[in-house]
From Swiss-Prot:
The species this protein was found in: Bos taurus (Bovine)
Keywords: Golgi apparatus, Membrane, Sugar transport, Transmembrane, Transmembrane helix, Transport
One term under GO cellular component: Golgi apparatus
GO molecular function: pyrimidine nucleotide-sugar transmembrane transporter activity; transmembrane transporter activity
Topology, Cytoplasmic side: 1-18, 74-85, 163-180, 236-248, 299-324
Catalysed conversion reaction: CDP-L-ribitol(in) + CDP(out) = CDP-L-ribitol(out) + CDP(in)
GO BP terms: transmembrane transport
Pfam families: Nuc_sug_transp
Name assigned to this protein: Probable UDP-sugar transporter protein SLC35A4
Amino acid sequence: MSVEDGGVPGLGRPRKARWTLMLLLSTAMYGAHAPLLALCHVDGRVPFRPSSAVLLTELTKLLLCALSLLVGWQAWPQGTPPWRQAAPFALSALLYGANNNLVIYLQRYMDPSTYQVLSNLKIGSTALFYCLCLRHRLSARQGLALLLLMAAGACYAAGGLQDPGTTLPGPPSAAATSPMPLHITPLGLLLLILYCLISGLSSVYTELLMKRQRLPLALQNLFLYSFGVLLNLGLHAGGGPGPGLLEGFSGWMALVVLSQALNGLLMSAVMKHGSSITRLFVVSCSLVVNAVLSAALLRLQLTAAFFLATLLIGLAVRLYYGSR
């Protein structure tokens, strides 16, 4: 099974074990993100600017990449540094930045539950760009696996967790603010489609870029996160008056920033040595971690929809990565 098909890079057991451990760590960090953010709340709200968290996360990624090159964890390319190859990463940073900001604006035109369910369409858009841009064909089994993955995400978003104090299943945020009627405006639908397309394009474009360039991963990340820091610094500065960069931060928030930075680096390795499809499975499997941590830390109840979503994810993994 090749890397492009979603297989494990390399045949040796040590490398396979490292790859598996990396995917498990990434899944755990993805799943822990929302529960850790919930633990940061003070009086029911986030005490810091979201742009501050994003900027500090990008800055942490940049510093870790620079450190890995300086101490020799990854070799610096011989000869003149290929700075011209940095330019294409500006588009990656722009796509990721647009995607992150669209998430915020989408909440104005639809309720959280509708967003959580319909945003799973980005799985389909990623698969579409994966086939068009990377010229990989998905088998019928793989296509069915991705459909099951979309269904699992929608099922979990619609009712995987429930606040014991309410009778309305759904995402914790939706349950806590109920009753909010399900709704989406025409503009919201257009923005959601745009969000899903940009999400798929950004993932596949970055994968294509990282695989075509014969540069160390740390140097490619250095290019990507340099543009990311500049972009998010501009967004933070242009966001108007508000809390300072470090105002409202706590130990929990520092853990969120560090875990997201490390997860970003792990995902870049998946994009270079694995595929965008592998990333989709990591994100989907993280729903299980998210639910278990939410139940343990936030005292939310798991519902039948959670177990159905878990079953669908397991079937999807078996179909996509199982023997053909």
